[in-house]
Structures are given as C-alpha cells and as structure tokens.
From Swiss-Prot:
This is Iron transporter MagA. Belongs to the monovalent cation:proton antiporter 2 (CPA2) transporter (TC 2.A.37) family. The chain crosses the membrane at residues 6-26, 31-51, 56-76, 86-106, 113-133, 176-196, 269-289, 294-314, 321-341, 357-377. Iron transporter, which is required for the synthesis of bacterial magnetic particles (BMPs). Probably involved in the transport of iron from the environment into the cytoplasm across the cell membrane, and then from the cytoplasm into the BMP lipid vesicle across the BMP membrane. The lineage of its organism: Bacteria, Pseudomonadati, Pseudomonadota, Alphaproteobacteria, Rhodospirillales.
Amino acid sequence: MELHHPELTYAAIVALAAVLCGGMMTRLKQPAVVGYILAGVVLGPSGFGLVSNRDAVATLAEFGVLMLLFVIGMKLDIIRFLEVWKTAIFTTVLQIAGSVGTALLLRHGLGWSLGLAVVLGCAVAVSSTAVVIKVLESSDELDTPVGRTTLGILIAQDMAVVPMMLVLESFETKALLPADMARVVLSVLFLVLLFWWLSKRRIDLPITARLSRDSDLATLSTLAWCFGTAAISGVLDLSPAYGAFLGGVVLGNSAQRDMLLKRAQPIGSVLLMVFFLSIGLLLDFKFIWKNLGTVLTLLAMVTLFKTALNVTALRLARQDWPSAFLAGVALAQIGEFSFLLAETGKAVKLISAQETKLVVAVTVLSLVLSPFWLFTMRRMHRVAAVHVHSFRDLVTRLYGDEARAFARTARRARVLVRRGSWRDDPNAGPGSGI
C-alpha cells in the first residue's frame, strides 16, 4: 500500500515506538532513555529499517543535546553545588586524567590509533546524568549526602564536556594552538566567574515576569533563549553546547526559574527522546557481532576500570568507604555526552567510522547494563560482610530473591498453560497433564 504522507507516517511510528519502548523500560524500573535507544535500534538499519536515513533526525538530535545541557543548567542549584564543589572538581579532574592517560598507555599494546585513544579516554571519563539520577531517585538516595556528591560530580563532568569538545576540535589543525588553548581557558574561567557572581544574588528578569502571564510566549521565550545563547556561543567560535549550558545556568538562577523550567521541559523531553533515538540508529549489530570479543572485552574493562577509578578518586577526596563505593559504582557507566564526543572526534577525523561504531556500541551497552551493575555491586558489598562457602552460595545470595520470584512466575505460567490445554482437549482431565 502506497503511503500518501510518508513523513507523517514515519513520525507516528517513531513516536509510538518511543512510547512503547520507554514505557517498557520504565515498567522494568530502568531509565526511559534506554528505551529510546532501543526504539532507535528497532527502527534503524539493525532492526526493521523503517528509519534508514539518520540525517533526517540529526538536526533535531542536535537540538536535543542543546536542550539537555540547557535544562541541566536550569536545574543546577549553584549554592548546593558549591557545598561539594571541591570533591566534584577534584574527582572529575582525576577521572579525566586517569581515563585519557590509561587509554594513551594502552593504545600501543591494543593497536589503537592516537585519535581513538584520546576520544575513548574522554568518552570513558563522562558518566550518564540521565541514568544515574533515575537510579538514585528510584532508591530515594538522590537527596542524601552521597546523592548530592554524585550529582555534583555529574554536573562537573557535564561542564567538562564543553572544554573537552574544544580540545578535540583543535586536533583538526594537528596541534593545540595558543588561540585554542586560550579559548578553552577563557571559557572555563568565564564559567567559574559566572558561578561566583550568581552565588551572591538571584536575578530578576523583567521580561520573563511579563511573559509568565502568557504560557505560550513563556515557552517560546525559553526556547529562544536556549538556542539564542547557543548561536551566540557558536558565532564566538565556542561550542553551541557551551552557550546553551550558560543560558540555562542564568535562567536557572532567576526568580522565574520554576515557571520557565516547567514550560521548557515538555519540548526538551521530546527533543531528548529524538537524541537518544538517533543514538539507537547508530548502533550496528552486524559490527557488534563481527567484533563481539573486542566489544565485550572493552565493555568489561571500562566498567571495572571506571568503578576502581571512581572509588579511588572519591577516597582520595576523603569520602568514607560506603559513600565512595556507592557513588563510584553509580558513576561506572559511559554517559550520553560520550556520543557527542565521538561525533566530534569523527568530524575532525580523529577516529574513523568503524572506530565511532566501536565507541557507540560500548557506550550503549554500558548505559543498558548500568542499573544491573549497580544492583549487583550493591548486593556484593552486603554479601562481603557474610562468610560465603561457595560460588553457588554467592550467586544465591546475590540473585536468590529474583530467581525465586522468576521460578514462582514460571510455575504459575505452566499451570495456566496446562489449564488452557485441558479446555482445548475435551479428553484431557485434571490429572492427565501432570
């Protein structure tokens, strides 16, 4: 059957797939963003091939990145961040230095190019704000001391993404020129000064007070501010993402913050869905299957390495062991901004298309497995205080409750199937199926 409005039909299919996959992940107590990635996989070349041209959603996905950083900036409570800023900055610097340094050391033994080592090191250093917040919210730990420390580190990492992008872009000239270095230093310095200034006062924007009376204009003005600050940043030869984040920070410390955030979030959620869906379109199962050993080995190395690095950095920051362990495990995945770093590396020819697929594959799998990893390590931390007699005893203590629940569900399903077969077969009796 010929489609008279194929664009509208595809948009409806994309929205339906995102709702179904996002709802399914939420039902399984997983972050909805994992479902959006799954929707992209199902609709993309690795699935049914309904969306074979990723360029069609690339522009909206870029807007999604800007909105994500803008909303993060709006939600940022500078006063609370300043309470943990020393731990957050110290830990983030160690994470970036440790990740990039380790990748550079491993590149000779593993045959990586210099570009892949740099991009992978930067990508591994960043954790997922969306996933970690969702996991901590589900366990009522977001507003605890360890939750606030973890959130502070996530914010510091998000702020570090922009300088890392600027550094990667400078590789296009084969060297970090003084002008590029000055650009990075000035952007970080301006951000620090803005934080210091905003921590002393709350801004009252007269125009937003007037716009608050009209919900449509308030929404439009918020979007205009987001994309306007991003555009100005781009004109100044800085990253548009940097401008969007700064714009969010300014509005987030205004008297009209709650109203503007409420207006911006629905559109931001849609654009964010498109961003994660576009990531799913990038996932190539043929590539993963062909390089399964490499992908799984790198995934295991990254997860274990990040956990150890995070815990070590937090202990050096004088966090107690339980807090360092929980925060370190929660931050063990690779974050959504790693895709942006990988695309930046690809754009400046630091990494090839195949190497980009490797970064994307490891990042997606890391995001999907992150809640399970936190769940497992949390249980192992408890089990460590108990004497374990065997590997079977360890598995029972880790997953015994889930295994028993699964067994009960399986028994009930068997009973229902047998009852159904008795109804279908008039000669069958209650005892015939047992």
